[in-house]
Design a protein with these regions (language model features):
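Electropositive, beta-rich accessory/interaction domains or terminal extensions
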Residues: 1-92, 97-99, 131
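Solvent-exposed alpha-helices and their adjacent loops that cap or buttress functional pockets
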Residues: 15-18, 36-39, 78, 115-118, ...
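Short, structured beta-strand/loop micro-motifs enriched in basic residues and often containing a Trp
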Residues: 65-75, 114-127
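Mid-chain, well-packed structural core segment of small domains
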Residues: 74-108, 237-264
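Well-ordered alpha/beta subsegment
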Residues: 121-144
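Glycine-rich phosphate/diphosphate-binding loop of Rossmann-like nucleotide-binding domains
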Residues: 146-192
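N-terminal small/polar loop signature for handling phosphorylated ligands or for N-terminal nucleophile
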Residues: 176-178, 184-215, 220-234
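Proline/glycine-rich low-complexity loops and linkers
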Residues: 227-310
Length: 310
């Protein structure tokens, strides 16, 4: 059980928020008249009161100084998994991300040289709307047993990132994942740059805590093909069987299947798999691995037991 100590809003992003006694929350939008409301995954930001109190030992800050919407006493949000649900009266919030990248013009960082929001803040979407008031109780709700697996899709393409080439592989992956029962939380097109890819893989695994990340492109022999190296750089454990199975299947179709350098790894509880860049190869590989992939994804997430056959 927690307690809502403060509600804070602002009309502009990148600024401190100011306390208000109550707020109206709208489903799939956020707090009415707050700058961060919208149809995205970071509708409401939350900070544990204990984290703010620890910061206040160095320098005094008001509630809302870190851009947080809700200050809650009694919960250490960083120790709870993404998809955790909370009730404040009739309002239901679902946690969607832990931490974030702090932009350079963050007001509190300019003033104090530090901002705890990237380390300690969490974000949520509004599942059920209503009105909340300072002093309300917050309850942690049981996690629904039938939550679908969550995925993200990253396309690697210099030309695609510049809008010079249509991305056909990314939408195909989304279509196939959706048909298999996954919820695709995010899609993006990145240039073939290791730094950008590593940052997004880390964010997807650590911040969004998706169960599966599928990349497409950048697995060949071109000097700009850096997807396997960037993927291995963020990995905790190797999961080579998936990539090996895809190469084996591709070789049954074309001898050029041996030229794929794609890898499959684990970062925390997230499985990351490199797919080829062409839509044809994407479809062939996904059709081959998807039926067996779910069990491995669920084991990595702690949702299923061992793989041993009986």
């Amino acid at each position: 059980m927690g307690k809502l100590l403060a509600i804070c809003t602002s009309p502009k992003r990148g600024t401190v928020k100011t306390e208000v006694p109550s707020a109206v929350l709208t489903p799939e939008w956020g707090i009415v008249e707050d700058a961060h409301g919208g149809n995205w995954h970071r509708q409401v930001s939350m900070l544990s009161a204990e984290k703010i109190e620890a910061f206040r030992k160095k320098i005094w800050v008001d509630y809302g100084a870190f851009g947080e919407n809700l200050v809650i006493d009694g919960f250490d949000f960083r120790n709870l998994p993404v998809t955790s649900r909370f009730a404040i009266g009739d309002v239901v919030l679902e946690m969607t991300q832990i931490g974030k990248e702090c932009h350079s013009d963050c007001a509190i960082r300019r003033q104090t040289g530090d901002c705890i929001m990237p380390r300690e803040g969490v974000f949520a979407r509004v599942v059920k709307g209503g009105t909340i008031h300072t002093g309300d109780e917050m309850k942690l709700l049981p996690t629904p047993a039938d939550l679908p697996l969550r995925a993200a899709v990253i396309t690697l393409s210099d030309k695609g990132s510049r809008g010079e080439r249509e991305d056909k592989s990314g939408p195909l992956i989304v279509q196939m994942l959706t048909a298999a029962g996954y919820v695709v939380e995010e899609t993006m097109i990145l240039p073939d740059e290791a730094k950008a890819l590593k940052a997004q893989l880390i964010r997807m695994a650590d911040g969004r805590q998706v169960n599966l990340v599928l990349t497409t492109g950048g697995t060949g022999f071109s000097p700009r093909d850096i997807t396997p190296e960037a993927t291995c750089a963020v990995a905790d454990r190797n999961a080579p069987g998936i990539a090996e199975a895809m190469r084996y299947h591709s070789l049954s179709i074309t001898p050029r299947g041996m030229l794929s350098r794609g890898v499959s790894v684990l970062r925390g509880k997230t499985l990351i798999v490199n797919l080829p860049g062409s839509p044809k190869a994407v479809q062939e590989n996904l059709e081959y691995i998807l039926p067996s992939l779910e069990h491995g994804v669920r084991i990595a997430a702690g949702l299923d037991g061992e793989c041993a056959r009986k």
